């Protein structure tokens, strides 16, 4: 199979809604000029051996030419000269050119890494959850095999918890939810077993493979450092250090949480770009003004999604250092993050931008658009969980940039280069969390936990697209390209 990429001399105005036959529209995503000439790419080779991947993969074969990008080893954020300056005329509300490549497939098979706990226990070593001695499962009392999903459990409870969360299972206790969980009762009452799993600290956010990425590992290291610092402070106090020394230590800690000049510059640049790329308010208001038919609601949601993607492309273009990445990596990052960034931006609109009292109305209208409750329920659950964190706009912007610059996306050739761009953003976000919510040292970890929840929407979204295609729904060409809809 040979794919051709042809440059567009003039922007092509997209019709609001058209059928999604293979189009000639492609995004030349981070280029200042239209693509010239014709490029070909040979597609071959299996996507992967894990059979669980195949139901959700929109492409079965792919191979890209090897490119060795040149990445400077110097600091990415040392001066303003690194930040891209984009002319206003680049933006077009029409179509963007994009080279087609397979969208990211979420599930890659479970690994030991996915079972590492979010809160690392002191007894754990480099064995990723293995323990010494005959310790017992905190859920059922059977012999524990290690720390799974943040709790010391046996293999049986680990598998039960994984299956229950993955399938969104709902169980019913025949005894009114009063079962005492043990090795016998665990097979008799699934509701009480699942409740005991959660009570003992098992976390759904540890569930999905690929979610315990470098971001979460960094989060774990940071939490460990916070705990060690707290223990050190307590020890110093118990040793009778005078108040002046304690005050000095506290002042020193506070000074460490201040943003450096480079970090302030980075944050200012991110916020300036984020604020310029806004969803038109009239699109959001349209679905609230009056009740439409299911088909009309779907068309409005399609228009909203198209604007989300346009905003995402513009914001992504202006991320510091992004255009130094290999072009294929840029496309992989954009297409791999499109769904997650869209839901994160939607969560901000849902919690901060809607007129007072309109959240329930929006939920009702979306439910009337023909989308299954199977997908709508977790979506609004996520929106509300984001709202509980009381995130600032700075945190929304940084979290969106971190989502885009995820080095674990599929088809990334130079992951180290992407990590170099993401790491400073994580550092700034961590400091802002300490500054904004000093009384809540877990706030940073909670934000990163929401990123793991976001990854599940790739799976939900892929299933929604499959159901929409069966029902012959129409999308704009831009959505067809970014979502790889044939």
From Swiss-Prot:
Start and end residues, zinc fingers (NR C4-type): 137-157, 173-197
Gene Ontology biological-process entries: bile acid and bile salt transport; bile acid metabolic process; cell differentiation; cell-cell junction assembly; cellular response to bile acid; cellular response to fatty acid; cellular response to lipopolysaccharide; cholesterol homeostasis
Positions that bind chenodeoxycholate: 345, 375, 383, 461
Residue positions, PTM Phosphoserine: 145, 164
Sites bearing Phosphothreonine, chain numbering: 456
Positions of crosslink type Glycyl lysine isopeptide (Lys-Gly) (interchain with G-Cter in SUMO1): 132, 289
N6-methyllysine carried by residues: 220
Effect listed in the UniProt record for changing residue 164 to A: Impairs ligand-dependent transactivation activity, impairs interaction with PPARGC1A
Domain NR LBD: start-end pairs: 262-486
GO cellular component, one term: nucleus
Modification note: Acetylated by EP300. Lys-227 as is the major acetylation site for EP300; the dynamicly regulated acetylation inhibits heterodimerization with RXRA and transactivation activity. Deacetylated by SIRT1.
Top-level taxon: Eukaryota
Gene Ontology MF: a single term: DNA-binding transcription factor activity, RNA polymerase II-specific
Tissue: Liver and hepatocyte-related cells express mainly FXRalpha1-type isoforms with isoform 3 and isoform 4 in approximately equal proportions. In intestine and kidney mainly FXRalpha2-type isoforms are expressed with isoform 1 and isoform 2 in approximately equal proportions. Expressed in pancreatic beta cells and macrophages.
Effect of residue 291 to A: Abrogates SUMO1-mediated inhibition of ligand-induced transcactivation at ABCB11/BSEP and NR0B2/SHP promoters
DNA-binding region boundaries: 134-209
N6-acetyllysine: residues bearing it: 167, 227
PROSITE patterns the record matches: NR_LBD, NUCLEAR_REC_DBD_1, NUCLEAR_REC_DBD_2
Subunit structure: Heterodimer (via C-terminus) with RXRA (via DBD); the heterodimerization enhances the binding affinity for LXXLL motifs from coactivators. Binds DNA predominantly as a heterodimer with RXRA. After activation by agonist binding interacts with coactivators. Interacts with NCOA1, NCOA2, PPARGC1A, CARM1, SETD7, PRMT1, GPS2, SMARCA4 and MED1. Interacts with EP300 and SMARCD1. Interacts with XRCC5 and XRCC6; decreasing NR1H4/FXR transactivation activity towards ABCB11/BSEP. Interacts with PAGR1 and NCOA6; indicative for an association with an MLL2/MLL3 complex (ASCOM).
Associated disorder: May be involved in intrahepatic cholestasis of pregnancy.
Family the UniProt entry places it in: Belongs to the nuclear hormone receptor family. NR1 subfamily.
Other remarks on this protein: Ursodeoxycholic acid (UDCA), a natural agonist of FXR, is approved to treat primary biliary cirrhosis. However, effects are discussed controversial. UDCA is also used to dissolve (cholesterol) gallstones as alternative to surgery.
Functional description taken from the UniProt entry: Ligand-activated transcription factor. Receptor for bile acids (BAs) such as chenodeoxycholic acid (CDCA), lithocholic acid, deoxycholic acid (DCA) and allocholic acid (ACA). Plays a essential role in BA homeostasis through the regulation of genes involved in BA synthesis, conjugation and enterohepatic circulation. Also regulates lipid and glucose homeostasis and is involved innate immune response.
Listed name of the protein: Bile acid receptor
Species the sequence originates in: Homo sapiens (Human)
Annotated gene: NR1H4
């Amino acid at each position: 199979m040979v794919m051709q990429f042809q440059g567009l001399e003039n922007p092509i105005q997209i019709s609001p809604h058209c059928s999604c036959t293979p189009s000639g529209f492609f995004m030349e995503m981070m280029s200042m000029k239209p693509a010239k000439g014709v490029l070909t790419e040979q597609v071959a080779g299996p996507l992967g051996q894990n059979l669980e991947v195949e139901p959700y993969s929109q492409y079965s074969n792919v191979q890209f030419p090897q490119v060795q990008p040149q990445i400077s080893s110097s600091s990415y954020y040392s001066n303003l000269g690194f930040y891209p300056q984009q002319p206003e005329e680049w933006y077009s509300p029409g179509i963007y050119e994009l080279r087609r490549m397979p969208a990211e497939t979420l599930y890659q098979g479970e690994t030991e890494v996915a079972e590492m706990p979010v809160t690392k226990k002191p007894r754990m070593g480099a064995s990723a959850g293995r323990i010494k001695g005959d310790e017992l499962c905190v859920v059922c009392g059977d012999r524990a095999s290690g720390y799974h999903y943040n709790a010391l459990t046996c293999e049986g409870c680990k598998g039960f918890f994984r299956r229950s969360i993955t399938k969104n299972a709902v169980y019913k206790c025949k005894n009114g939810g009063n079962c005492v969980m043990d090795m016998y009762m665990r097979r008799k009452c699934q509701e009480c077993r699942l409740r005991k799993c959660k009570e003992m600290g098992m976390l759904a956010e540890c569930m999905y493979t690929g979610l315990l990425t470098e971001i979460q590992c960094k989060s774990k290291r940071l939490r460990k450092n916070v705990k060690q610092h707290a223990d050190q402070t307590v020890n110093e106090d118990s040793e009778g250090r005078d108040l002046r020394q304690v005050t000095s230590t506290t002042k020193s800690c506070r000074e460490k949480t201040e943003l450096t000049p480079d970090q302030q510059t980075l944050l200012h640049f991110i916020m300036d770009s984020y604020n310029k790329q806004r969803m038109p308010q009239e699109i959001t208001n349209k679905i609230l003004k009056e009740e439409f038919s299911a088909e009309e609601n779907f068309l409005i949601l399609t228009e909203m999604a198209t604007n989300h993607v346009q905003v995402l492309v513009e914001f992504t273009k202006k991320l510091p250092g992004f255009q130094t990445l290999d072009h294929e990596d840029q496309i992989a990052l954009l297409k791999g993050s499109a769904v997650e960034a869209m839901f994160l931006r939607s969560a901000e609109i849902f919690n901060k931008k809607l007129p007072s009292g309109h959240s329930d109305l929006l939920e009702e209208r979306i439910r009337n658009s023909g989308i299954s409750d199977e997908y709508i329920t977790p979506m609004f659950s996520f929106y509300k969980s984001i709202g509980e964190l009381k995130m600032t706009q700075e945190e929304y912007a940084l979290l969106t940039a971190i989502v885009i610059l995820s080095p674990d996306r599929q088809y990334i050739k130079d992951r180290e280069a992407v990590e170099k761009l993401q790491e400073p953003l994580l550092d700034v976000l961590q400091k802002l969390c300490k500054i904004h919510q000093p009384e809540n040292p877990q706030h940073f970890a909670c934000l990163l936990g929401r990123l793991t929840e976001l990854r599940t929407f790739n799976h939900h979204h892929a299933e929604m697209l499959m159901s929409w295609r069966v029902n012959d729904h129409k999308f704009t060409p831009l959505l067809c390209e970014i979502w790889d809809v044939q």
